[in-house]
Amino acid sequence: LVGPNSIGLVSTATGLDATFLEGRPPEGSLSLMSQSGAFIAAVIGWAAQHDIGFNDVVSLGNEAVLDEVDFLRQWDDDPATDVILAYVEDIDDGQAFIETAQDVTATTPVVVIKSGRTEAGAAAAKSHTGSMAGHDDAYRAAFEQAGVLRADTIQDVFDVGQLLAGQPGLDGDRVAVLTNGGGPGVLTTDAVGDSRLDIATFSDETRADLDELLPAAADITNPLDIIGDADLARFDAALDAVLADEAVDGAVVLSVPTALYEVDALADRIGDRQTEHGTPVVACLMGGEPADRAADTLAEYGIPNHFDPARAVASLEALADYGDIRDREYETPTEFAVDRERAFEILAQADDREVDYLGVEAMELLAAYGIP
């Protein structure tokens, strides 16, 4: 039983549409659950416009029976779900969520956008669902412990979700930047520098190959600027050499539109080279309507296209974060005997006194949680 206070659910694979939404989302490998029906209604049309497909979409409502933990388990066992996305305002059973998410994220990425991060947002969440949103630092720590990737914006949720669904894992932090325009290449390099990622150092063999392939005016270091007169053949040859380098774990490919190549054809070359080498790639094919068409071509290869290089780097960084999550081993947490009744009594007394701090009662509260 889903709900109450839910707009229903959709399963695109089976054709089930038990909602009153205006349109049905396209079929895909993302599964989305949300504690806000309005969030689903807001993003479904936008996602369809951007060719973002879903396997299941579930409005959780007030979670009288089924909650986010149940759907984590459901989608972990579902081969049609590659990535789980979630909008949450609060989580009632934090321990169950953490333990379940640790199991799930070993094979299936989970990306969560958590509202109520600020005092004003928490108050709005309470008025919306009646939920008591906990302190955001506690949620941040819980998500980290659970192996959950946290997104701060709607755009981030789908940027990361699409990349995780379409690209192989990032085995390291070394990134190549390939561009035909100096300015965007520098912006991308700055974004890499602001992230956990590193600018890769090309091997001597790759540098020798690039020296033969590129004009004398081109600098064969990383970021690799193949200069503004690059045609399709130069783009393709340079990308082939870069992705073949074992010192490169991932790549950002940028193109500034010129009359020397068709951007649709470039998108096909990028997709073919990524498939050939198996190295994760994100693209920034800039421009207007032709770039939109190229983005559709890239999507067929599971490669996202971003106008802003910072978004491309951020999604690639999330791919590296998930690689760490997938490979890590969890320690069994220490369990304490908790006297919850006494703990609530201490906090209630402090609330009655209208104070936001504890004096000597803090020791009693720690003792109630078994903390010496």
Sequence positions of predicted segments:
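Catalytic-core regions of core metabolic enzymes
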Residues: V2-P372
